[in-house]
Amino acid sequence: MADILTQLQTCLDQLATQFYATIGYLSTYHDNSPAIPHPDVPDAAPALAKIPKNSTAPPVPAGAPVPAQSQASPPAQNPAHGAAGAGTSVGEGGQTPGPAAGAGADPNLPAPDSPRTFASRQRELARDLIIKEQQIEYLISVLPGIDSSEAEQEKRIRELEGELRRVEEERELKMRELKRLRRTLENVLRAVETGLYGDRELLERYS
């Protein structure tokens, strides 16, 4: 299991991702016109454009120029449709009418959610942000020494250093004791082997 600082960093990264996802959803699926920056505030954040469908690009200001790859020429007109519309392209007074008022929105942009769905998802996103923020607060509260002053923490560090030295000295004593016991055990085993089989040289001489 990761330590507290690693968990805290992970939660902060997740919170930033949730903020980004929340802003992206609110900017894309609302049914209102984008907010206009106040003219008297030069550093106001610009309005975000809606995110096209199946796009992984981050939100951009609504007034930003369209990228070069998306500035394609208008689609070729259907010959049959063009021929049919040729007779009606000129209105009274020789003026060409503008685009039809009933023309739909950009098909690449997702349709806005219904007010009920939008409000429900707003609450869900807000709840997720609150839960993640509470997790971060809990991890901060359990950090060691969070309620101690700098002097108290330095004193505690010195105490731990002294305790570590004592433990290291005990470990060295145990290691020396272990080596002594191992030599004693080897001598006992050698004596037992000699007592059972006698002197090997004598056995080999008279065998």
UniProtKB/Swiss-Prot annotation:
InterPro entries: Med7/Med21-like, Mediator_Med21. GO terms for cellular component: mediator complex. Residues 37-121 are annotated as: Disordered. The keyword 4Fe-4S does not apply. Residues 65-80, 97-108 have a biased composition (Low complexity). Residues 146-196 form a coiled coil. It comes from the Eukaryota. Pfam families: Med21 (PF11221). GO terms for biological process: regulation of transcription by RNA polymerase II. Keywords: Activator, Coiled coil, Nucleus, Transcription, Transcription regulation. It is found in: Nucleus. Its main location: nucleus. One of its GO terms (molecular function) is transcription coregulator activity. Residues 84-96 have a biased composition (Gly residues). Component of the Mediator complex. Belongs to the Mediator complex subunit 21 family. Component of the Mediator complex, a coactivator involved in the regulated transcription of nearly all RNA polymerase II-dependent genes. Mediator functions as a bridge to convey information from gene-specific regulatory proteins to the basal RNA polymerase II transcription machinery. Mediator is recruited to promoters by direct interactions with regulatory proteins and serves as a scaffold for the assembly of a functional preinitiation complex with RNA polymerase II and the general transcription factors. This is Mediator of RNA polymerase II transcription subunit 21. The lineage of its organism: Eukaryota, Fungi, Dikarya, Ascomycota, Pezizomycotina.
